[in-house]
């Protein structure tokens, strides 16, 4: 699983997962994982499994306004991407209005979405650089 960043569209919606500007770092805290996200970016979730195994992922998003969104289960493969929340206008993006993601597959984990400054303070790691469209994945094969 990876969290692929991109510049947040002003509309707050995308038709499909945009080109990735790179994976966001994830750090472990005492009880959860931390995901740094600035106000000008959003992310989609990349999914993969190894060795021909199939996995079912259950995902719950908890927003800062108190709203909770439970997704239908996602079977990997064939699914490779969770672009956002389907809402009839495409996908509402995962952005800084998201507080938590709860992920359940073989085990459960919670991912807390925090600002870059808070991420650096809580982890001692450098905050990621601001998103830059010059770093967009162009479709070439990776090694």
List each language-model region with its residue ranges.
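Intrinsically disordered, low-complexity segments enriched in small/polar residues
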Residues: 1-143
